[in-house]
Structures are given as structure tokens and as C-alpha cells.
Amino acid sequence: MEERYDAGGIEGKWQKRWEQDRTFKAKEKDAREKYYLLEMFPYPSGRIHMGHVRNYSIGDVVARFKRLQGYNVLHPMGWDAFGMPAENAAIQHKTHPGKWTYENIDNMRAQLKKMGFSYDWDREVATCHPEYYRWEQLIFLKMLEKGLAYKKSSFVNWCSECQTVLANEQVENDACWRCGTVVEQKELEQWFFKITDYAQELLDDTSKLSGWPEPVLTMQRNWIGRSTGCEIDFPVADSDLKIKVFTTRQDTLYGATFMSLAAEHPLAMELVSAECKAEVEAFIARVRTQDKAKRTSDDFVKEGVFTGSYGINPVNGRRIPIYLANFVLMDYGTGAVMAVPTHDQRDFDFARKYDIPMIVVIQPEDQTLDPATMTEAWTAPGVLVNSAPFDGLDNESAKEKIAAHLEEQGVGRKTVNYRLRDWGVSRQRYWGTPIPIIYCPACGIVPVPEEDLPVLLPMDVEISGEGGSPLARHQEFLKVTCPTCGGDARRETDTFDTFVESSWYFARYTCPRFEQGPVDRATVDHWLPVDQYIGGIEHAVMHLLYARFFTKVMRDLGMMAHDEPFKNLLTQGMVCMETASCPEHGWLFPEQVVEGKCVLCGATAQTGRNEKMSKSKKNVVDPDKLILSYGADTARLFSLFAAPPEKDLEWNEQGVEGCYRFLHRVWRAVYDNLEMISGVAVPASVDGAARNLRRQVHATIKKVTGDIDGRFHFNTAIASVMELVNAIYGFEAKAQYPGVMREALEATVRLLAPFVPHVCEELWACLGHEGGLEAAGWPAWDEEALVEDEKTIVVQVNGKVRGKLTIAADADNDTVQQAALKADNVVRFLEGKTVRKVVVVPGRLVNIVVS
């Protein structure tokens, strides 16, 4: 055994051995209980960052721990490889997105291997590979057959300068991120997945996800947004048109004095009178440049325009003006709102602004509301007035009665509405999965026959940054023979939203080389659900919801038996670091600040707050440099020790150095005692300091096991091992009890193995074991060793600590009380005082009350 801890040499040695032995390969036919551990796979940006290190270190602890416990662990890794960054890089660096992506994958794979993560690399997938996306295309075709995929018109972000559709994240301050042109809403034909067919099941099944954080479940429930109410038909005056309105407040129907429609409503232009046309068109053009999220925020300026048309309130025949309003969206309800200004604050403000009449229809029992003097809407419960036969009813009771009345009259119906909208999956992008559809002038929309899959993404394209998808200009790809009639036809040039790839990758990992379909039914049913999924909470209502939807769809397509993809979910916190800046050079990298000065100009650097590590603010740490300086085990240890997994981690160099010193200390403890403990065993009976050390060893085993298993309290688990190492260094009876010292050192190595596997494998071998740590398994604690002969009791006088005493663990309260009254340093606080009461808390403390 070398005297000094050489992190680089040790880590290289064990990583090579693990790869040669395929140590982490999951076995298909295995009697052991399965455990599927998965972290959200990364986009291959080119380099891993400290967020990756933390996320994957958390997962690796669990995977290694479960493997040591005897589970057959599946722990795969792959690449969410399609997406816009590759196209942007292609434009910037004049390279092909595929070349850029695969080079990045190679680089990041090497980085992950340097971290020593226990991945089964035989199961690696890249979603940009045809052998992955061919099966995604097949799933789409099956969904099309079932009516779960369809095409319709939808509004998208459109840059008129670039002549292309922009994703939401490409819209910055209402403008195109590339050219600065104001973005508008444009109606295009898009493909959709009918996730709304599963809205109720997705909502109901959140109750089954007891292993998920409640905030994630709450976000999903709110996103699905189930509400019960009425759909009401409002006839348009002097026409045959009807406007459908969804409301949860049918109790206020008699108070509707105007209607608000989304600017994108399909009837918007049909409702416009000649005299209002110019103003309405200008309004619609303006609204289409406004961010949808901002339009509904409370502080956004509410605007509207009168269409020149009137609706008819179906319960009282009142003519009410129809407005277009910027705060109404097509994304909720029907895109049309019956506006009751006296009982909705937004409608109240709008009515005051545009001088629209108001009618009170709900008021408190002891008060009469007057619209002329009201300063805000009345939104509390009350009694109906001005509501014909329903006057006098409390408004909650009136909801049911008015709903029944609407159904009787044939002008409305009780219904359930969801905030959730069908998932638009079309992207006018090149670097994505081609949608397997052919357009034929004679046959219309024709699915690509299954035997012709995959529809390959052509690689001989030039990414120029010009408007539109390059696929639309690629004649060999575009022109095709119709499989139905044999005539000339063209391919769909849209590609799938990249969230489609990540909605089923966890299933493909179970059988990544299966060639007869997306998944092998028996294999996927064995491995799913994922026992532990780990990733960021920012994916709560996109990826995590879509993955649940896809699982249910694949179940209904007969591809798997499971209802849910992920049994347990851990959402880890961010990695944060102080920012630093210079008046001359702006944001600075950490290495550009030395002794508080900018190394570029010598100016005093300004230190900012701790923020999420980001390239833009340069508060980043390069994992490669960290590994080079300290080793992968130190990087892993700090990322696990500095904060609980679900909390944000604040980076500091001193903490990293402390973890590095700790590993040196563990190494030294084994090195210094190796010769003495060689070949010895724990004696049958021990006492004194040896018994205390054994007790701490087994208490630590018990604590670390509980902290890892299910709770993920890695920081406290590591802290308890650090305390054990301190006890090892303080064990003065090691020459008398070398077997106890050996047990303590071996326990330390085994307990640290999931956290810092390289150094622990090396130390385990140094301790004379040939089988490796996995062969040894996870240590079990001995309950007998935990039994205490003595306890240390704190003694207080009038609530202040005045001494401690050591007493037999089984001493009764009288014995403890008498010993406390005679304890050193306690007696002097009792002199001249009267003892009024003695309170004994068994096993912990004695409080003597005197006066």
C-alpha cells in the first residue's frame, strides 16, 4: 500500500477495471429483486457541469447502495440528442448538427466515465439515432390509428424576418432572439397528441404517486386544472352564430353585461362590423405580438376593442356587447368569457375602463350593493338578486339550479373543463425526428407504411439560418411516391417536439437493442416502473407529465402493462456560487479573481450573491479541472455532503478542500494501522474504549443505512462516518484490540463506498480482500453491540447545565437522582439551597429545582 493517497492513479485503475469487467451490467435473467435507478438524461451540449455532477452523484449513491444490498440494478445513461442548440451551433460554427452532436456525446461520455458513475453503458441510447427514432415514428402511427394524433390549425410564434416558427424560449422580450424582429402569432397547421383524452386519469393517478414530492403533484394537478361548470350558448344578435362560453360561475349569469373573446377566436373576424374593422384588425395585430403568459398576469394592462356585434344573454334576452380582450386566451375554456363586472375584478376594471353597464346579482344578506358606488367587485358568497326565479337563493345552491334550468331550456349543459390542452408536437426544425406522414393530392394525409420506417433524417443538408426548415428545401427527402395510389406526393417536413423523445426513453432502456418494436413487452414489464427517478423540478409539468401520458398510451397500445413510469421521484436542488464582476470586464470566472482583484486589470472585483451556476454569469466550476486537482471522489463527496439533495448547494472551495483532506485522513488511518490489524478478528468480548468504538461502528452502520435508504440524507450519513473516523483516530486501545480497529476501518470503507467508490475499492483491496466491495455486500449492524452499559447524563440546576455523570444504563430513577445530587460541580450549586423538586428524564438529563 502506498503511503500517499493518489486520487488520479487510483481512479484510473478502477475505472478501467469496471469497464473491462462490465461490472455494472444489469442482468436480464436474475433471481435477485430488480431495482431501476434513473437520472434524467442530458442534452449533449459538449461538457458536463456541476449540476450534472451533483445529479448523477446522487443517483450513483443509490445505485451502488442497492447493488451492495443485493439488488439487480439497472442504471443506464443516454442522450436527449435532438434539439435547437445543435442547429444554432451548426450556423455559428459552420458544421453539421449531427457531427456536432456526436462529438459532444463522445466528450461527455468520457467525462462521465471519469466521474466513476456506475452506468450500464451497453444500454446507451441517443435519441438522434435512427434505431431509436424509428420506434418513435411507429408509436406515432399507432396513436394516429387510435385517434390520439391529429392535425389542426394552431397559433405559433412567427418571425417574419427569419420566416420561421420560434419556440417560446427563442422569444426574448417579445422579439426574435436571432434578429430582434417583433414576434407575431401566426396560424399554421400543426400535429397534436390528444393528451386531453387522459386528463382525468392523469389527475386521478396523482393519488397513486406517494413517492413523488407534493409540490410536483400540486403543479401537475394545477396544470391539468379540472373545473366543473356549464357550457352556455350565447346567440349572436342578427345572425345564426352562437358563441360557446365555459363558466364555473353560472350563478352570476344574470349579471353578464358584455362578452370577452380571445383575439385568436375563430369567430373574431366574423363578428366585426364594417365600421369597427380597422380598429379590430389593428388590435388583433397588436395582441398577436404580446406574450401569452404576460397577457393574463394581474399587472398587465388590460385592453379590448368592441367588435360591433352583440350577444344575447340566453336567460334574460339582454343584448350585450361583444369585445375582443387581450387577457382572454384560446388556451383555456372556449376562448370566450361571459363578463360579469360586479362579481369579477378583471371584468370590473374592464367595464369601468370602457364604460360598460353593471348589474349586481349577488350581494351579502345584510347589505345592498349599488354598481354606481362599488369600488371593487363583490367576489364573496351571498344571496342572488336580479336573477328572476332564483332570487333569494344562496349562490352555491343557485349553481345547481341554474345549471339544470339551462339544460331544460337547451341553451347550456353541465360540463367538466380542463386547463390542459392537447400537446402540439410539430416543430418547423431540421434536427428532430421526421413525422412519418405523406401528403398526396389524391389521397390526402397518408401514414408512412410501417415497413418503410424509419423515415430517415437526411444528413446532406446545409444549415444556413434561412427561414423555414431545411427539409422543405431538400428535394430528395420532400418528393415521394404515395404508398396508396402510386402518384406524386410530398413528405411532412415538420419534426417532433424533442419532449416526445424523452417521453418514453426510460422504457427503451430496458431493451435498447430490441428490433421487433419500441419495447419488448416481457422485459419492459419486468423493469418498469422506474424505482427511483432523479431530476429537476423545472420539468414538473412538461417532461414528467408527458412521460406519464406516454406510459398510459403505450399501455393502451398493448406495449406494456404499467400505468405510471416512475414510482419515486427526487427533485434535486441547484448548484449555486457567488458571482464576481469587474467594472471594466463584466462578469468574471472564479479563477479571474485573485485576492479580491480582477486579474485582467487589477480593479477591485465586486462580489455578488449566490446564484445558480451559469455560463452567462461565469460563476461556474469546470468538473474536469476539479477532477484534475482533487479527484472524482472528492468532487462526488462535496456535492453530496454540502447540502441535502433537495436543497440548493452553495459552492465553496474550502468545502472541497475539506472533503479532500478527509479522504487523505481515511487513507492514512488504513495505512498507519494496516500491519497491526492484518489477519486479526474481533474478539469474543471487549470492554471499555473498545466496546465504545464497536458501539459507534454499529450505530454508524445503522444510521448510514437509514439515511441512504429512502431518505437520501447523504450529508448526515457522511457526517456520521466522519465522526467514526475521528473516533478511530482517538482509539488508544488499538494495540490491545486490533480486531476492533480492523472492524472499524472496514466498516468505514464499506459505508463510504457508494459515495467515494474508487478510494474505497482500493482500500478494500489493501485490507486483503480479493472479491471487491460488491462481493462483501452492505454491512449489517449488530443490535447487541448497540446496547449501552453506561449512559452520560446531563445534570442541570434550575435549568442550567452544571455537570455530567456517567451511570449504569439500567439504573433506576432513584439511583440517577441520588447520583446527580452528589455529582462533582453540582454540590456547590446546592449549598445553602432547598431542593424543591428533582426531574429525571430517563437516559438524558436530571434537572434539580432549588430556591
Swiss-Prot record:
It comes from the Bacteria. One of its GO terms (biological process) is leucyl-tRNA aminoacylation. It catalyses: tRNA(Leu) + L-leucine + ATP = L-leucyl-tRNA(Leu) + AMP + diphosphate. Disulfide bonds: none annotated. ATP binds at residue 615. NCBIfam families: leuS_bact. Belongs to the class-I aminoacyl-tRNA synthetase family. This is Leucine--tRNA ligase. It comes from Syntrophotalea carbinolica (strain DSM 2380 / NBRC 103641 / GraBd1) (Pelobacter carbinolicus).
